[in-house]
Amino acid sequence: MGKLLIVGIGPGNYENMTIRADRALKESQVIVGYTVYVDLVKERYPEKKYITTPMTREVQRCQMALEEARTGETVAMICSGDSGVYGMAALLYELRGESREPEIEVIPG
């Protein structure tokens, strides 16, 4: 079973990203996010597999991230700002259900 990292990338540029967030994105094989946010990090991590959805597709985005993590990948779900407050943490925990798989870690931005 893989792992799902919910990563806050800060207000939008690499210089404002935390060291911990950068490390999480480097560790991940897959980066999932809203298309605009993925465009902000894609140049920095070109070797990653990217999955994007447009705005208003949050449930679909979370389901795709969970599916990737369940295949054994380390997946980063990127969010602007703080991943626990503005991000997808609550929705991902809800969609994961009681199975406790995959492991989820919240990394604030």
Spans of features found by a protein language model:
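Class I S-adenosyl-L-methionine
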Residues: 1-107
